[in-house]
Regions:
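PRY/SPRY (B30.2) beta-sandwich protein-interaction domains
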Residues: 2-529
């Protein structure tokens, strides 16, 4: 009996290591622990400083530079991902956006590296009490699915990963985890094979889990509203069922005469079926203008701030350009002006101007104090355009924040309500179809909705795949503009000499779409009668 116990003990021992090997192992462990502590600190430093980046040409914070350097090697990349999962808190409004920014700027990982990370997460053990950790895991999975679309994305969506994300929808008690599980599933579904796999998994349940969340899209809770928006968007655009009508077929558009313009929007912005709510879940900076233009008088609209992160909301003319992949949006040229209530900045001509501090008020959500010029989820941003006095004013919850005049040095008319969105941001516009919460009391004004008129066809917000199918059926003339496919291509760009653009589209270009060279002059051809 004693011999048997000794035998068992010998088998259970760790393999013998020479003293030198043991020291090497201890050093490796210590080195890994030190690296983890350093990376944790760098991630938190980046999170703290990200709001101070106010210029696209500005050098990134040193913490970000160090993280990118560490992530150049596989072990470093894995450590950066682990640290983001472990240390980014739930209550920071830019937490998910920082994960997206860091992963987007890091070197593209290999499929094997991502699979290693998935195993480290131990996704077979779904659920758990650490909601922030699970939220961060879902954000990272979504980012990886977007960056590695195609066969690599299929490999990442293992049975454990799919079960983890679906199980979060069913059993997670935290709406943040549910929201980013939905977004991760959406990112994986960009690959057709994954889309079919996810759809099959959802249909295996007695009731599609997304159906119960769709009902939240009109909730008074901003977090529930986000979940409802994303669930409805997935059901309309990705996981379509014959049993369910599209939202545009059932939405009530009574009294809505101005909407966000689905034909004047950057490519990845999501717009609700009623045309009044917008959300960005892409890593790019997405923008949109409304359908109604104003040239004189005094005008006002309001925006419900659903997420408290970085958005630039205000006014723009048609000459304002959307350069979503370069990070330029409303307020980033001389033909637009916007307010960013997350960083408390006014944007114009790609330059920011800090808004003077207002007295602080208690933030009941986080038990902290915040400036009255800083928005939070549920805030109402008021945007007033006075073309009699040539001024624009912004207010938060009825309190004036700032008055601006600089836009009128470059534009006097042709203004649209407009906005740009960073990753995971959402808001709802009120152009007058509902009573305003905080209407101006110091001057008479008009709402867009009281003057504008849309016909029934113009009010339809089609799901993206139906819109693209509709475009494919259009007959295109040989001399049509290669950008809008609407007007005749009569412009030659100089000095590159590329052709194929109409007058209106050429005015929006800074670089040639063909060769990316700078445009110095556009020459219009004479049109023979």
């Amino acid at each position: 009996m004693g011999t048997c116990f000794c035998k068992d003990r010998i088998e259970e021992r760790e393999p013998y290591l020479a003293p030198r090997s043991r020291r090497a192992t201890v050093c490796e462990r210590n080195s890994k622990n030190i690296l983890a502590e350093q990376v944790n600190k760098l991630v938190l430093d980046t999170l703290a400083m990200i709001g101070s980046i106010v210029d696209n040409e500005q050098d990134p914070p040193m913490a970000m530079v160090c993280l990118h350097s560490i992530a150049d090697k596989e072990a470093g990349w894995i450590q950066v991902v682990e640290s983001m999962v472990d240390v980014i808190p739930m209550d920071h409004p830019l937490g998910p956006s920082v994960i997206t920014l860091l992963l987007d700027d890091c070197p593209l990982p290999s499929k094997d590296s991502v699979i290693k990370v998935s195993k480290l997460f131990d996704l077979s053990m779904s659920g758990g009490e650490d909601s922030a950790r699970h939220r961060n895991i879902c954000v990272i999975l979504g980012c990886m699915a977007e960056k590695l679309a195609g066969p690599s994305s299929v490999a990442i969506l293992s049975k454990d990963t799919l079960h983890y994300l679906i199980n979060n929808l069913i059993s997670s008690p935290d709406l943040h985890v549910i929201l980013f599980s939905l977004i991760a599933l959406e990112k994986f579904a960009q690959t057709s094979e994954n889309k079919a796999t996810i759809k099959k998994k959802l249909s295996s349940h007695p009731v599609n889990p997304l159906y119960k969340f769709e009902a939240l899209c009109s909730s008074e809770s901003c977090l529930e509203r986000q979940v409802g928006f994303c669930a409805r968007w997935c059901l309309d655009n990705l996981f379509v069922s014959n049993e369910r009508k599209y939202s545009y077929e059932t939405v009530d558009l009574t009294g809505i005469e101005v909407m966000l313009n689905t034909r004047d929007v950057s490519e990845y912005l999501k717009i609700s079926p009623d045309g009044l709510e917008a959300r960005c879940d892409s890593y790019s900076f997405e923008s949109v203008r409304c359908t109604f233009q104003v040239d004189n008088g005094v005008w006002y609209y309001e925006t419900l701030i659903i997420t408290s992160g970085i958005m630039q909301i205000g006014w723009a003319t048609k000459d304002s350009t959307f350069l979503n992949h370069e990070g330029y949006g409303i307020g980033d040229d001389e033909f637009s002006l916007a307010y960013d209530g997350c960083r408390r900045l006014v944007w114009h001509g790609a330059r920011s101007h800090a808004v003077p501090d207002k007295p602080c008020i208690n933030d009941s959500t986080n038990n902290t104090e915040r400036s009255m010029s800083q928005w939070e989820s549920g805030s109402i941003l008021g945007c007033l355009l006075d073309l009699n006095k040539m001024e624009i004013s912004f207010s938060l919850d009825g309190v004036e924040v700032v008055v601006c005049t600089q836009l009128f040095e470059h534009a006097k008319s042709g203004f649209f309500a407009a906005a740009s969105f960073m990753s995971f941001q959402q808001c709802k516009f009120n152009f007058g179809s509902e009573p305003f919460k905080y209407p101006p009391t110091d001057r008479a004004f008009k709402s867009f909705n009281s003057i504008a008129k849309l016909n029934p066809e113009e009010k339809i917000v089609l799901p993206r795949h139906l819109y693209l199918e509709q475009l494919r059926k259009l007959s295109i003339h040989e001399d049509s503009c290669t950008l809008c496919f609407d007007k005749r291509a009569t412009v030659t760009l100089h000095p590159c000499q590329h052709r194929g653009f109409c007058v209106d589209c050429s005015k929006l270009l800074l670089h040639c779409p063909m060769c990316r060279s700078m445009i110095y002059k556009s020459e219009q051809e004479e049109i023979s009668s």
